[in-house]
């Protein structure tokens, strides 16, 4: 066959078109003349956001060609994290999936393709970006303020320029990767450029096509007189009624190769591209968007010339055919001019068609749609109708041309080779024309060769078990069709596809059997598993070759059985050939007929050693030769006893004849040795020794907990009885002699003398030794004495397994009957989930076909990652056939458009709104995971948020999870906000959470943070405690946090005392004693002891249970408890309150503030309830372990002060400490204020905002994109300005010290006081605008480094800055926003906390010595404000004025900001609140 030099084969194709999920459905619709442009209902249009005004407009056409599932994508398959998938242009998503299907259709696995693959693709401008993603952003911020990282990332995921390179990146393609943009002709131009690339040798295979989606999707369009769109919603090319086109959505691709290369590779060829051409209209036309008939004629004529064909041989043209009154006549004019060049008369008219009548105009994908339609016409030798064609547009003058329009489906009649042209013309003038030809007969027709005899192995794989199940069902359905493909071709086609992690291998006999097997939930002929990966290397290209991972195991005496491998002998010529060769050799040496012994069992006894050992050698040797024909090679051999001779023969130590002689002699001499017996014992070799009689010896160690002993029969019998009486499992081994013991000594001399006369060679494949349990050296292999000692020495099989299982992904193949050796391997301590075992032969009790078992085992090897050459099961001329493509998961990844709010919600930096559209990518991470440090908890949360997943495996590779360089930048930026120093490069060096955590923690260790400096030292107090002792409440014992528990009356004082003892002994901070030493406070931790701080009280008589009087009595006793505490060295005090008869009792706790923060209270609450539950159940109290105690943390604090992250903030704190210009209290109006206040010198004013006022605050938060704390502080600034005066006030704020600058400690379960305190300047002015004031506070809070932890370290621990900062006056006011206090429902549990959860926030006396403490919290839908003040320093009138003015200032601030005409603030983030509070606020924000 002559092959044109410039011919290109179409070897694969795929597409999704309106009304068609794939190419097969597309042809079905074309053949049936189905129009896939649908009418949209009014409800559909309303749901899509179409207004009533538009619906009422008569110019609005309610028609559209639609694609199903444009919001769905298999993100996991392509390695996209959910969040990245959500913002990826759906045009790119569909192109990715169709590209994969096209490669599958071509039988091309890019990973195995020997050559480069190019990509030429196109997509329309991203409507998803413009309509959906950017609707969540202020257009001024996007367009007018310059490019930022988030915007760049967003455009990278959506711009058409990145379509082709995205495919190349996803599939690891190395050829040219070109995005093509010529408007409507783009996808056909892409095909042309791909052909040129193939012809020039730039690539060896190419993908070409286009993707176009109309978004919004389920909407109509507007028409107007003279426009190019149809007023009736039908595209009617060439018809007299043609009034325009209808734009639609679709995607299509073809896979191309040079024709000669495709034929040589045996590819299936759908059609042949004989030539193509492109040009441009230039300016000789009515306008930029108008067509040019002369240019169109030129491009068609040039394509004919390039193809080397005469236009008279073209019998069909797929036209651009838009159905416009202007475009169609011009196109026919150009066609007529191009075809009139021919001087050859035509035998029949040339048929015209346009797929736009079926599916509309697919914009940039229009050309590929026409090309695929035409290829299908060539394959099916038929031409579908051009819909809506009744009579020609007279402007076409078809009667003066060689053309006719196909108006109904019919055969493609042709005298010679079928040829067709495909045109595509773009707005702007780029024209393209491709000449197609039907595939050569030799390539298009399935070979008439008979189906090969015997079963086939069907291989399927998928990324998930669910996808594999869908593939099985779809394949079964395809095989059940009447004209289904040949089974051997199905197996061949599937074997050429790329393999995924979840695999299935099925041994099937015919199509009906295959369908049954595929549909069965379980079947003996099916193996389903996961590919084994090296735990260190995974899928990396530099991982060990699969042959090095494979180890062949050859069983020995005892594995034999009559009929073994009979099915293989009868059906596999290779096996039979090698069996016969060995059998002939053994017949010559021993006179034994192994055919009769093995297959019939009629000769003598296969249990006899002189029969069984030759039989095993013959079967296993033939089996190894058979598996070798399938390309399976091993990197090492282990033989068990006799099996070691088979291993050595295959490794080249013995030639076959020498091996047969050696095994024959060995078997005869062993048979002639004194009889004995053997038993397997469930004990290790050391443990079994104490039970052994004198003449019983260790014979084999198969795994560390099992061994075999051997000796005389009577002594073995006695041993069995003794072991049975001791309860030790013991079982008989099929053996007639005491093998591998000194009982074999008499034969050794004769055997060694024989071997010394034989030639032994070093092995070609490494061997493990039964004798030593390690690798055989060349010297050992060729030494006859070693082989002789093996006979009488114990087999150290467990040690051999110890060696091979040290490699993380070994594949152990038992090459022989049964599965005893692989069974021992799976019991070995080094066995792991990355190891695999495969058994090539059935167990004697299994009633299954030998060949099916063998082929299924080959399938298991393939599943484990071993390359299997399936050629022996292929027909002489295999063919690719059309089979269902990969069943991509249909998971929704979509951001709905937002038509009302432009401002971007925090956390939606990549274009998605706050939260997620479908809930599938919520990134909520539990901060209490076993085995994770605080560093890892934070990194886990950051990774989850950036990847858009709910959790991340700590050992998963960041880049395998879909991470890339841009996401690495996002993670580094997020980590910086958490106080962790990470660079994007760190993720390349440490790509797992575990390794990155270790690296981050190691950086702390380098600064002396990893270990306490002195293990036995009494630690100094941390900075916050120093602050408290230095400047806080004078009667330090009074600073207490109260908790109330309600107890079932059956709980007595012994129970309470036991619980409190357990909790106090569990948490060292609760045993804290402070000791002053020369002006320096030290912490002493008392030894665990019984809790003695429990007193007992009763509710007064006559008070009813549950009454208000009882509540008042309980609160009164609690108040007395708090007042009575004067000693700070009793961190926990408690009182039990016995209530009225039959009513609940109460337990009141008073916890010193020095040992508790919000997290500590949660820990204590959990532990107390847990301890009570265990106590009441009669169990020992066992609480969850504490990884790092308070004492250890305190020892590390000094090192934190010299950490670079803290030292880097020195200038910030020194500068800010001098900014205050206004003080609420006189510095020292009289001497007594130089001392901290006593509890009785503090008083409180309380107020509550109504639910409506609080809602106003929430509305302000949403509108201004500012945190609650920011708004409250701004209102505080206004309040101070109005009541005290204008200036800058220093305000003390709180931070969360647990989660910042984390050393290598785990504080998740540590009880202690980790709250940090730091000052910030607050501007107080009456003339400052509301938005300006909010911005000023926002920027102040945003600038605070590391939640303020560095301030305390530099103030109280680091001496150089301590002197400077200590000279500054303590801020007058302390502000604390405690967030939302939950309401606990009352229940009937025996132990439950008081439902009033405001008590621990509301009641504690301020302890930090400020003139004013403003404590704000949310409860019951209202905002509560507690103003505590030092009566010595703040006049009551001032305090009352502040309390009275604040709500008014807050309301005025919000109203003024709302009334502003525009917002000016930066909405990139909300900072400044305690971490937990910030998360609560963010989660409650509206998506828009």
Curated annotation (Swiss-Prot):
Q: Which GO terms describe its molecular function?
A: 3-oxoacyl-[acyl-carrier-protein] synthase activity; fatty acid synthase activity; oxidoreductase activity; phosphopantetheine binding
EC category: transferase
**Annotated ranges, domain Carrier:** 930-1004
From the UniProt record, list the reaction(s) this protein catalyses.
icosanoyl-[(phenol)carboxyphthiodiolenone synthase] + 2 (S)-methylmalonyl-CoA + 3 malonyl-CoA + 5 NADPH + 10 H(+) = C32-carboxyphthiodiolenone-[(phenol)carboxyphthiodiolenone synthase] + 5 CO2 + 5 NADP(+) + 5 CoA + 2 H2O; docosanoyl-[(phenol)carboxyphthiodiolenone synthase] + 2 (S)-methylmalonyl-CoA + 3 malonyl-CoA + 5 NADPH + 10 H(+) = C34-carboxyphthiodiolenone-[(phenol)carboxyphthiodiolenone synthase] + 5 CO2 + 5 NADP(+) + 5 CoA + 2 H2O; 17-(4-hydroxyphenyl)heptadecanoyl-[(phenol)carboxyphthiodiolenone synthase] + 2 (S)-methylmalonyl-CoA + 3 malonyl-CoA + 5 NADPH + 10 H(+) = C35-(phenol)carboxyphthiodiolenone-[(phenol)carboxyphthiodiolenone synthase] + 5 CO2 + 5 NADP(+) + 5 CoA + 2 H2O; 19-(4-hydroxyphenyl)nonadecanoyl-[(phenol)carboxyphthiodiolenone synthase] + 2 (S)-methylmalonyl-CoA + 3 malonyl-CoA + 5 NADPH + 10 H(+) = C37-(phenol)carboxyphthiodiolenone-[(phenol)carboxyphthiodiolenone synthase] + 5 CO2 + 5 NADP(+) + 5 CoA + 2 H2O
Q: Where is the Ketosynthase family 3 (KS3) domain?
A: 5-438
Q: Please list the cofactors this protein needs.
A: NADP(+); pantetheine 4'-phosphate
- Pathway in which this enzyme or protein is active: Lipid metabolism; fatty acid biosynthesis
State what this protein does.
Part of the PpsABCDE complex involved in the biosynthesis of the lipid core common to phthiocerols and phenolphthiocerols by successive additions of malonyl-CoA or methylmalonyl-CoA extender units. PpsA can accept as substrate the activated forms of either icosanoyl (C20), docosanoyl (C22) or lignoceroyl (C24) groups from FadD26, or a (4-hydroxyphenyl)-C17 or (4-hydroxyphenyl)-C19 fatty acyl from FadD29. PpsA initiates the biosynthesis and extends its substrate using a malonyl-CoA extender unit. The PpsB and PpsC proteins add the second and third malonyl-CoA extender units.
Q: What is this protein called?
A: Phenolphthiocerol/phthiocerol polyketide synthase subunit E
* Species the sequence originates in: Mycobacterium bovis (strain ATCC BAA-935 / AF2122/97)
Lineage at the top is: Bacteria, Bacillati, Actinomycetota, Actinomycetes, Mycobacteriales
């Amino acid at each position: 066959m002559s092959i044109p030099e410039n011919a290109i084969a179409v070897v694969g194709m795929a597409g999704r078109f309106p009304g068609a999920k794939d190419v097969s459905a597309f042809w079905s619709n074309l053949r049936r003349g189905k129009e896939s442009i649908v009418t949209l209902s009014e409800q559909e249009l309303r749901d899509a956001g179409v207004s009533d005004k538009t619906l009422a407009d008569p110019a609005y056409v309610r028609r559209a060609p639609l694609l199903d599932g444009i919001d769905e994508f298999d993100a996991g398959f392509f390695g996209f994290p959910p969040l990245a998938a959500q913002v990826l242009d759906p045009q790119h998503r569909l192109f990715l999936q169709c590209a994969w299907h096209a490669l599958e259709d071509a039988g091309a696995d890019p990973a195995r393709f020997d050559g480069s693959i190019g990509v030429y693709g196109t997509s329309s401008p991203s409507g998803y970006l413009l309509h959906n993603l950017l609707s969540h952003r202020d257009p001024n911020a996007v367009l007018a303020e310059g490019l930022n990282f988030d915007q760049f990332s967003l455009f990278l995921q959506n711009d058409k320029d990145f379509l082709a390179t995205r495919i190349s990146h996803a599939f690891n393609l190395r050829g040219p990767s070109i995005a093509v943009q010529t408007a409507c002709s783009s996808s056909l131009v892409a095909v042309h450029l791909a052909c040129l690339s193939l012809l020039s040798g730039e690539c060896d295979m190419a993908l070409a096509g286009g993707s176009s989606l109309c978004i919004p999707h389920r909407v109509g369009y507007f028409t107007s007189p003279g426009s190019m769109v149809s007023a009736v919603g039908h595209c009617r090319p060439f018809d007299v009624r043609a009034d325009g086109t209808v734009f639609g959505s679709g995607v299509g691709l073809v896979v191309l190769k040079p024709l000669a290369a495709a034929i040589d590779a045996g590819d299936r060829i759908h059609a042949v591209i004989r030539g193509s051409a492109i040009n441009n209209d230039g300016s000789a036309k009515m306008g930029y968007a108008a067509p040019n008939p002369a240019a169109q004629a030129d491009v068609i004529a040039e394509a004919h010339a390039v193809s080397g064909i005469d236009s008279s041989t073209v019998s069909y043209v797929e036209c651009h055919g838009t159905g416009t009154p202007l475009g169609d006549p011009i196109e026919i004019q150009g066609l007529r001019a191009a075809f009139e060049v021919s001087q050859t008369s035509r035998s029949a008219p040339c048929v015209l068609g346009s797929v736009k009548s079926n599916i509309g105009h697919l914009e940039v994908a229009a050309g590929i749609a026409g090309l695929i339609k035409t290829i299908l016409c060539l394959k099916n030798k038929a031409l579908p109708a051009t819909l809506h064609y009744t009579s020609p547009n007279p402007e076409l003058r078809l009667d003066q041309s060689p053309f006719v329009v196909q108006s109904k489906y019919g055969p493609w009649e042709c005298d010679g080779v079928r040829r067709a042209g495909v045109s595509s013309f773009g707005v702007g003038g780029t024209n393209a024309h491709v000449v197609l030809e039907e595939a050569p007969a030799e390539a298009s027709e399935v070979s008439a060769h008979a189906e090969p005899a015997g079963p086939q192995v069907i291989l399927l794989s998928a990324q998930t078990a669910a996808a594999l199940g869908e593939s099985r069902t779809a394949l079964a359905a395809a095989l059940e069709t009447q004209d289904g493909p040949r089974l051997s071709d199905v197996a061949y086609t599937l074997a050429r596809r790329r393999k995924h992690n979840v695999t299935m291998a099925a041994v099937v006999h015919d199509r009906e059997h295959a369908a049954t097997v595929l549909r069965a939930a379980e079947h003996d002929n099916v193996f389903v598993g996961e590919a084994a990966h090296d735990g260190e290397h995974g899928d990396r290209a530099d991982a060990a070759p699969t042959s090095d991972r494979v180890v062949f195991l050859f069983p020995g005496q005892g594995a034999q059985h009559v009929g073994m491998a009979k099915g293989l002998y009868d059906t596999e010529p290779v096996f039979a050939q090698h069996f016969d060769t060995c059998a002939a050799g053994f017949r010559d040496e021993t006179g034994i007929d192994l055919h009769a012994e093995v297959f019939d069992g009629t000769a003598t006894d296969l249990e006899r050693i002189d029969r069984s050992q030759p039989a095993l050698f013959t079967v296993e040797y033939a089996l190894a030769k058979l598996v070798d024909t399938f390309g399976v090679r091993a990197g090492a051999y282990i033989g068990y006893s006799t099996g070691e001779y088979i291993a050595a023969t295959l490794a080249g130590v013995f030639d076959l004849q020498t091996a047969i002689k050696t095994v024959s002699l060995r078997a005869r001499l062993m048979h002639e040795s004194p009889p004995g017996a053997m038993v397997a014992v469930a004990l290790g070799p050391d443990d079994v020794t104490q039970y052994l009689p004198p003449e019983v010896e260790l014979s084999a160690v198969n795994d560390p907990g099992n061994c075999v002993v051997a000796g005389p029969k009577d002594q073995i019998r006695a041993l069995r009885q003794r072991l049975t009486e001791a309860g030790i499992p013991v079982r008989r081994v099929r053996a007639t002699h005491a093998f591998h013991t000194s009982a074999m000594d008499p034969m050794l001399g004769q055997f060694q003398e024989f071997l010394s006369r034989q030639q032994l060679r070093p092995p070609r494949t490494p061997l493990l030794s039964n004798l030593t349990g390690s690798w055989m050296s060349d010297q050992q292999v060729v030494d006859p004495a070693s082989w002789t000692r093996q006979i009488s020495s114990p087999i150290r099989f467990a040690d051999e397994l110890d060696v091979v299982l040290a490699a993380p992904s070994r594949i152990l193949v038992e090459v022989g009957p049964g599965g005893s050796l692989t069974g021992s391997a799976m019991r070995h301590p080094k066995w792991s989930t990355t190891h695999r075992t495969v058994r090539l032969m059935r167990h004697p009790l299994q009633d299954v076909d030998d060949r099916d078992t063998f082929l299924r085992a080959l399938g298991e090897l393939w599943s484990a990652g071993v390359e299997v050459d399936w050629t022996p099961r292929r027909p002489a001329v295999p063919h690719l056939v059309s089979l269902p493509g990969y069943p991509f998961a249909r998971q929704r990844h979509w951001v709905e458009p937002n038509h009302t709010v432009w401002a971007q919600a925090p956390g939606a930096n990549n274009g998605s709104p706050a939260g997620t559209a479908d809930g599938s990518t919520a990134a909520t991470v539990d901060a209490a995971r076993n085995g994770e440090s605080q560093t890892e908890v934070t990194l886990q949360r950051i990774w989850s948020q950036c990847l858009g997943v709910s959790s991340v495996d700590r050992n998963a590779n960041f880049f395998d999870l879909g991470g890339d360089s841009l996401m690495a930048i996002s993670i580094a930026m997020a980590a910086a906000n958490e106080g962790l120093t990470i660079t994007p490069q760190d993720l390349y060096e440490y790509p797992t959470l575990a390794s990155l955590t270790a690296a981050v923690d190691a950086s702390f260790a380098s600064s002396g943070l990893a270990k306490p400096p002195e293990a036995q030292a009494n630690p100094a107090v941390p900075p916050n405690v120093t602050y408290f002792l230095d400047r806080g409440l004078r009667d330090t014992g009074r600073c207490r946090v109260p908790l109330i528990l309600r107890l079932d009356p059956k709980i007595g004082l012994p129970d309470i005392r036991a619980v409190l003892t357990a909790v106090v002994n569990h948490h060292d901070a609760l045993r804290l004693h402070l000791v002053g030493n020369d002006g320096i406070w030290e912490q002493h931790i008392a030894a665990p002891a019984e809790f003695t701080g429990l007193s007992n009280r009763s509710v007064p008589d006559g008070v009813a249970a549950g009454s208000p009087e009882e509540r008042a009595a309980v609160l009164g006793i609690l108040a007395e408890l708090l007042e009575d505490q004067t000693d700070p060295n009793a961190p926990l005090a408690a009182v039990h309150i016995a209530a009225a008869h039959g009513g609940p009792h109460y337990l009141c706790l008073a916890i010193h503030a020095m040992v508790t923060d919000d997290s500590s209270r949660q820990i204590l609450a959990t532990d107390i309830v847990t301890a009570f539950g265990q106590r009441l159940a009669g169990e020992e109290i066992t609480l969850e372990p504490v990884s790092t105690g308070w004492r250890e943390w305190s020892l590390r604090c000094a090192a934190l002060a010299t950490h670079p992250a803290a030292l880097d903030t020195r200038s910030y704190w020194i500068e800010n400490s001098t900014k205050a210009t206004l003080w609420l209290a006189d510095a020292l109006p009289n001497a007594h204020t130089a001392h901290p206040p006593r509890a009785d010198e503090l008083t409180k004013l309380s107020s509550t905002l109504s639910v409506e006022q609080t809602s106003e605050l929430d509305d302000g938060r949403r509108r201004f994109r500012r945190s609650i704390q920011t708004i409250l502080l701004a209102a505080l600034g206004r309040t101070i300005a109005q009541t005290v005066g204008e200036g800058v006030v220093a305000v003390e704020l709180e931070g969360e010290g647990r989660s910042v600058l984390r050393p290598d400690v785990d504080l998740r379960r540590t009880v202690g006081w980790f709250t940090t305190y730091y000052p910030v300047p607050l501007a107080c002015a009456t003339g400052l605008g509301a938005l300006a004031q909010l911005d000023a506070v926002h920027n102040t809070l945003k600038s605070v480094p590391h939640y303020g932890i560095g301030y305390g370290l530099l103030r109280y621990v680091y001496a150089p800055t301590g002197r400077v900062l200590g000279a500054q006056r303590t801020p007058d006011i302390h502000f604390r926003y405690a967030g939302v206090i939950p309401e606990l429902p009352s229940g009937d549990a025996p132990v439950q906390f008081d439902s009033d959860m405001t008590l621990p926030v509301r009641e504690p006396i301020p302890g930090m010595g400020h003139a004013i403490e403003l404590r704000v919290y949310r409860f019951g839908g209202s905002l509560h404000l507690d103003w505590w003040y030092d009566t010595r320093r703040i006049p009551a009138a001032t305090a009352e004025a502040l309390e009275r003015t604040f709500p008014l200032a807050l309301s005025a601030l919000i109203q003024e900001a709302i009334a502003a005409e525009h917002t000016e603030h930066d909405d990139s983030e909300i900072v400044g609140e305690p971490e937990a509070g910030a998360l609560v606020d963010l989660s409650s924000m509206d998506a828009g």
